[in-house]
Amino acid sequence: MFTDLAISGGPGLLTAPSEVQSTFTRVSNTQYSNCSSIFRLGERTFTRQYAHIYATRLEQMRPLLIKSAKQRWGDDIAVRKLCELQGGEKCCVIGTLFKSMELQPSILREISEEHNLLPQPARQKYISDSDELILEDELQRIKLEGATDVQQLVTGAVLAVLGAEEDAGKFVVEDFCLTSLPVQSPLPRLSEDRFVLLTSGLGLGGGSGDSLMGLQLLLDLVTGQAGAEEDQGCAARISRVILAGNLLSENTQGKDSLNKAKYLSKKTQAASVEAVKMLDEILLQMSGSVSVDVMPGAFDPTNYILPQQPLHRCMFPQSALYSTLQLVTNPYEAEIDGVRFLGTSGQNIGDIYKYSSMQDYLDILEWTLQVGHLCPTAPDTLGCYPFYKSDPFILQNCPHVYFCGSAPKFSCKEVTGAEGQRVLLLTVPEFCSTQTACLVNLRTLQCQPISFSGFGADDELGD
């Protein structure tokens, strides 16, 4: 795709100098709209309980699931609340899942056992054969048995189940369904190729020289300073860059300094300070050439809970002068030349990975699209703001490109909805470990990785 454009009859790197002055004209975003206002926090009150967000989530998603249930099981299916169940009656029940997990970390358990047992080692996954699913609605809860995938499903997902209540007070499930994809706006018809470059996990301050080499090559590519004239012409078609979180390394968190006496750390400087200065210089180079959207991540200097608010412009005294630099929320939703992008920095996908049997980030990304919610495990195992009027993480519009950052590897696939929705799923890998970025063609919705790992020091030593 992107590479094919550069393979033509144009001059290469080893051609004689030309008297014709080469030009680098960047394509512009004629149509751009930041649609992330729903993730901006105005009043911040943390005195409310988290029960409100589960109640409003169920209230908002119930009509969607009733529609999906009737499409799947027929219009004559009886939809009951848990308090209306009658023994043996086959019906449909809609509720929020709670997954009872023996291995799930609990601060209360840690406090009660800290004097008697050694701390449990960190696990990649917390699922076990003893896990149970419980369905809750506004008033009651009931244990689920039967045709449910206990290992795959997670707490917080809202779904419809078909079955009957047994005498023992358990609901035997025959089938279950998730919500259908929301309405999608039609794709625009672009006359030329335009690209959006996505990368994540720059990991600044981590001390890896290889990743900095790859990062500089990435900057040279985006700004049109790498390759021959034809390559630069292709780079000029990159209309926007999205940095999907974790711009700083986990090593910059400086948690060790919290345990030191003040007189030992008074004259030391946090590792994140130099990393932010480096980020400012990178954004200065990039935003001077192309529009850049910067999303925060788990290791970046902003609030920890979702939705993460934009990084403050005061941290970037050089690059903040450019109007092309846009500091955005996580999650982030925008419309670029008529193509709707929606994505996160990866915390939601990584959290589901721990509490589900799903192994592939791309499968988890597709599952969140099917369940109609960006982060169903919030607020149980993933921190989020205690919303009470509405749940902003419910999918209101079907995106054309749905991505997550900080993934272990690059992967993409296209899924099609029941009403013809076409969605490109994309996992953006950590740049600091893979030296890989992603290019999305807005005209065709095709995606390809661009790797800079072949330029690392390890490869040179290996030769």
From Swiss-Prot:
Q: Does the keyword DNA damage apply?
A: yes
* Superkingdom of origin: Eukaryota
**GO molecular function annotations of the record:** DNA binding
One GO CC term on file: delta DNA polymerase complex
Q: Which Pfam families match?
A: DNA_pol_D_N (PF18018), DNA_pol_E_B (PF04042)
Subcellular compartments? Nucleus
Q: Which GO terms describe its biological process?
A: DNA repair; DNA strand elongation involved in DNA replication
The UniProt record lists the keyword DNA repair: yes
The record's keywords, sorted A to Z, are:
DNA damage, DNA excision, DNA repair, DNA replication, Nucleus
Q: Which InterPro entries match?
A: DNA_pol_a/d/e_bsu, DNA_pol_D_N, DNA_pol_delta/II_ssu, PolD2_C
| Protein family per UniProt | Belongs to the DNA polymerase delta/II small subunit family.
Q: How does it assemble?
A: Component of the tetrameric DNA polymerase delta complex (Pol-delta4), which consists of POLD1/p125, POLD2/p50, POLD3/p66/p68 and POLD4/p12, with POLD1 bearing DNA polymerase and 3' to 5' proofreading exonuclease activities. Following stress caused by DNA damaging agents or by replication stress, POLD4 is degraded and Pol-delta4 is converted into a trimeric form of the complex (Pol-delta3), which consists of POLD1, POLD2 and POLD3. Pol-delta3 is the major form occurring at S phase replication sites, as well as DNA damage sites.
What does this protein's UniProt record list under function?
Answer: As a component of the trimeric and tetrameric DNA polymerase delta complexes (Pol-delta3 and Pol-delta4, respectively), plays a role in high fidelity genome replication, including in lagging strand synthesis, and repair. Pol-delta3 and Pol-delta4 are characterized by the absence or the presence of POLD4. They exhibit differences in catalytic activity. Most notably, Pol-delta3 shows higher proofreading activity than Pol-delta4.
Q: What name has this protein been given in UniProt?
A: DNA polymerase delta subunit 2
Organism the protein comes from = Xenopus laevis (African clawed frog)
Q: What is this organism's lineage?
A: Eukaryota, Metazoa, Chordata, Craniata, Vertebrata
- Gene name, please? pold2
